[in-house]
From Swiss-Prot:
GO MF term set: ATP binding; ATP hydrolysis activity; ATPase-coupled transmembrane transporter activity
Keyword ATP-binding: yes
UniProt domain ABC transporter: residue ranges: 6-247, 304-537
Disulfides per UniProt: none
Domain of life: Bacteria
Naturally occurring in which organism (per UniProt): Staphylococcus aureus (strain MRSA252)
Keyword Transport: yes
Cellular localization per UniProt: Cell membrane
Protein name (database record): Putative ABC transporter ATP-binding protein SAR2766
Chain segments annotated as coiled-coil in the UniProt record: none
Keywords for this protein: ATP-binding, Cell membrane, Membrane, Nucleotide-binding, Repeat, Translocase, Transport
Function: Probably part of an ABC transporter complex. Responsible for energy coupling to the transport system.
E.C. designation(s): 7.-.-.-
Length: 570
């Protein structure tokens, strides 16, 4: 019988800063060549599990270890980080924490340089993998000029060069646009098939990541593995709901259509599922009997107006934003989508005054260009994509209170507002914690809280749901909906097709610095050309409609959106 390449036996780990173990009594074997998906809510222990395998725990991050862990038949606790890196390659969730070089090419070549590889061979290797991860045109760019998704692809290329027998990817889709994420998963699957490496992917976005190419899924909750099973069996169980993880949209749609999902053999393969005549009949019957009128219209009063706005970085030949014309309406929830590097984050920074622009921005029919960043912050709050770019304080409470203190508010009033927002964002229990002890997703919630507490009229959130499990996703989005009902205008820059379809009244699509679409979410997701231009990926609902033979997929998509909203309101 094949020996496991990774073996946990009665394994527990507790950080020195925590009162209870983050991992509790883990017993699992992973065998050579397996492709395993690790799933769990934010703070469930899945990243800690991965870090125990790659050696960051205990060689960099200290804590109390009990039980046994063997990697490649070696006791994992007596090795060292350098030796472990020859066996385990890791793409971290926080891309800034992994970027070393001054350019993308230099970063990808880091390992080769340390191994004294000849320059000609080094260039060939870097070019080969840069082509694979679609970064060949960005090799000479500095890290600060790359989007979060582009940085992640650079890190992926640098790890793939090493060809380690074990490859770990921690939230690989977190900063990628949907189409690029899909291509990344396809690339990883091809690499897995070609190299027969052991691949562990840590992810909670099952809509994009889960399929029947995975041998197993490990589901974490509160530091324990509550499911160790096949993708199909996991989807048939109630374990995902128990762990606060959202199932793929098509599974939810099947249940709304009263399909008996437990009777489906391979539920993780959508194409096979839709070949069933029973499934086709049930879904079409659901569409025919249910009204799908869109009841979510945005207001017609402009609040923010952008006229021919352009932004150009000094070392880019082309404009990052090119003659952008855009109205943002009072009390709407607007989503802005597009491929990595399309200009989405640049647009937000231009509105907030972080970048010099040409063109004109008006707020409430008054000139906005001449206002300083501080003056604009009275009206507009901005939550950046990377939480590490925003955090200034060491403690959670102090970080959320920072803006209020800068405005001279009384400490007693600050306490009330900060604690209220911390409760809403699921952070109240951690209010006295150091920020360094938080996961990436928890840090993201801290930055959202630090802006929400200031109560601006417009809130811009760059990837608000990145790194969030379904429970905290719903908590944050429910709070944003409530703010919207109170009169706040919400702008969400996102790759999340769930968020786009479920919470947006309008969607603006950017591509190469230009607005290429400005319409409803359903029409965006139903337009193959727009999805291709903007590197969007149509959801599993659209794929379901095509497989079943529904001539107007937008009917199924709109029906699902309306029905799901009603269910969530109950």
């Amino acid at each position: 019988m094949t020996e496991p390449i990774i073996s946990f036996k009665d394994f527990s780990f507790q950080y020195h800063s925590q009162a209870t173990p983050t991992l509790q009594n883990i017993n699992v074997d992973i065998y050579p060549g397996e492709k395993v998906l690790v799933v769990g809510a934010s703070g469930s222990g899945k990243s800690t599990f991965a870090n125990c395998i790659n050696g960051l725990i205990p060689f960099k991050t200290k804590g109390n270890v009990t039980g046994e862990l063997h990697i490649n038949n070696q006791d994992a606790t007596v090795s060292c980080l350098h030796k472990r890196s020859n066996v385990v390659g890791t793409v971290l969730q926080d891309t800034d924490g992994q970027f070393i070089g001054l350019t993308a090419a230099e970063d990808m070549a880091f390992l080769l340089e340390n191994n004294c590889v000849e320059q000609d061979d080094m260039k060939k290797n870097v070019s080969y993998w840069a082509e694979k991860v679609d970064m060949i045109e960005h090799l000479n760019h500095r890290p600060q000029d790359l989007s979060g998704g582009q940085k992640q692809r650079v890190s992926l290329g640098g790890i793939l060069i090493h060809r380690t027998p074990i490859l770990i990817l921690d939230e690989p889709l977190a900063n990628l646009d949907p189409a690029t994420g899909h291509e990344t998963l396809r690339l990883l699957n091809n690499i897995h098939e070609e190299t027969k490496s052991t691949m562990i992917i840590v992810e909670h976005r099952l809509e994009e990541s889960l399929d029947d190419t995975f041998d197993r899924v490990l589901l974490f909750k509160d530091g324990k593995i509550i499911a160790n099973t096949t993708p199909s069996d996991l989807l048939k169980s109630s374990k995902l709901k128990e762990a606060g993880i959202r199932e793929p949209l098509y599974c939810t749609a099947l249940k709304y259509a009263e399909v008996d999902v437990e009777s489906i053999d391979n539920l993780a393969n959508l194409r096979e599922v839709c070949m069933s005549e029973h499934v086709k009949f049930k879904v079409k019957k659901w569409i025919d009997k249910t009204s799908s009128n869109d009841d979510n219209k945005y207001k017609s009063e402009p609040l923010l107006e952008l006229n021919e706005v352009c932004v150009q970085y000094s070392d880019y030949s082309n404009s990052v934003l090119n003659n952008v014309q855009l109205n943002v309406y009072r009390r709407e929830m607007l989503s802005i989508v597009g491929h990595n590097g399309a200009g989405k984050s640049t647009l937000a920074k231009a509105i907030c005054g972080f970048l010099d622009i040409t063109g004109n921005i008006q707020f409430c029919n008054k000139g906005f260009n001449q206002l300083s960043i501080s003056e604009r912050s009275e009206f507009i709050g901005y939550v950046m994509q990377n939480p590490n770019h925003m955090i200034s304080e060491k403690m959670i409470y102090d970080e959320v209170a920072l803006g209020l203190r800068a405005r001279g508010m009384k400490e007693s009033d600050i306490k009330i507002r900060v604690e209220n927002v911390l409760k809403i964002c699921g952070l109240y229990a951690f209010r006295n914690w150091p920020i360094a002890a938080l996961s990436y997703g928890q840090k993201k919630r801290v930055t959202i809280a630090s802006v929400l507490v200031l109560n601006p009229e417009i809130i811009i959130l760059d990837e608000p749901t990145a790194g969030q499990d379904f429970y905290h996703y719903n908590e944050i989005m429910s709070f944003l909906i409530e703010l919207n009902r109170q009169g706040k205008t919400i702008i969400m820059i996102t790759h999340d097709m769930h968020l786009l379809s479920e919470y947006s009244s309008r969607t603006v699509v950017l591509s190469k610095g230009q607005v290429v679409a400005d319409t409803t979410p359903v029409l965006v997701l139903n337009d193959k050309k727009i999805c291709e231009i903007a590197s969007l990926r149509q959801t599993s609902l659209f794929e379901m409609a095509e497989y079943i033979g529904i001539s107007e997929p937008q009917k199924l998509i709109q029906l699902f959106i309306n029905h799901d909203r009603k269910v969530r309101r109950q």
